[in-house]
Design a protein with these regions (language model features):
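Hydrophobic membrane-insertion alpha-helices, especially the h-region
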Residues: 1-13
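Stable alpha-helical elements in mature extracytoplasmic
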Residues: 39-42, 60, 131-138, 142, ...
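N-terminal low-complexity, intrinsically disordered segments
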Residues: 59-100
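Active-site acidic/histidine clusters and adjacent loop/turn architecture
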Residues: 106-155
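Second-shell loop/turn segments in exported
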Residues: 121-134, 160-162, 206-218, 251-252
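Extended, low-complexity, intrinsically disordered C-terminal regulatory tails
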Residues: 140-143, 147, 155-177
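Catalytic cores and adjacent binding grooves of peptidoglycan-active enzymes
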Residues: 183-253
């Protein structure tokens, strides 16, 4: 557990090193702030608050009660379509870039997203591991909150899998060759958007724990949904529940 929280400090330090970029770039604009930018400044202030530690306790008997019991409830709870997310992504993200070479020239505006204590990054075929600072902070907060929820219930720790991050125009074109449902106007092109798989979780092995059983995947999915739903209700993100891609499609606001 000490290793987990020690590594978290490293992750937090990397994000704090560039956390003021998005705030400064918005504040430095000579134009009046629109509603999207004003909301983004509020989200930045919210995400910059220290993460409050939780008390770890023994797992209570029985399953936890969740509102997420059917596919329809998931879809109704996360209804934010592409056009809603796209307007925010275009306003707050980087310009869409043609290819990864061009994206590399914007790395001073991006945060590298790699494996961390709270999530794993899948092998990325159609995206590259970068996000704007606000989105990177949001991703960590969601997955940190998921770990907190597990520990507060006495469950073993699991890490969700991130399956998509920044996409170039070339990435989008290649993806559309194999996935006809992929949008040409992808929010992923602006570095504000990421996908978290809802049916793949990797357990954090504790050598000292030989008794705790694995958690049912549906229970993990519902618990992750609870955390993401809380963030959406706070106004930190837009979320679409993707059935065919088996992921939560999330854009930082």
């Amino acid at each position: 557990m000490l290793v987990l929280f020690g590594l978290s400090c490293c992750v937090r330090g990397c994000l704090n090193a560039c956390k003021h970029y998005s705030q400064d770039s918005i504040s430095a604009s000579s134009q009046p702030l629109d509603s999207i930018q004003q909301h983004a400044l509020w989200v930045d202030s919210l995400l910059s608050q220290p993460h409050v530690p939780i008390a770890v306790r023994e797992r209570p008997s029985g399953r936890f009660v969740t509102r997420f019991r059917t596919e329809q409830i998931f879809m109704d709870s996360f209804p934010d379509l592409n056009d809603v997310q796209l307007a925010t992504a275009q306003r707050l993200g980087i310009p869409a870039v043609a290819d990864r070479e061009e994206a590399s020239r914007l790395r001073n505006r991006l945060v590298y997203v790699g494996e961390c204590p709270y999530y794993l990054v899948d092998k990325l075929t159609y995206s590259t591991p970068y996000l704007v600072p606000r989105a990177a902070r949001l991703l960590e907060e969601i997955c940190h909150g998921f770990a907190d929820s597990l520990m507060s219930r006495g469950m073993p720790l699991y890490r969700p899998v991130v399956t998509s991050l920044l996409r170039t125009q070339a990435d989008v074109a290649r993806l559309r060759c194999v996935n006809g449902n992929a949008s040409e106007q992808s929010c992923h092109q602006y570095g504000t958007t990421f996908d978290i798989c809802y049916n793949r979780f990797v357990r954090v092995i504790d050598p000292a724990d030989t008794l705790t059983k694995d958690v049912w995947p549906g229970e993990l999915k519902a618990l992750l949904a609870e955390v993401i739903c809380d963030h959406r209700q706070k106004g930190t993100c837009y979320v679409k529940y993707e059935i065919y891609q088996s992921c939560f499609h999330i854009t930082a606001r």
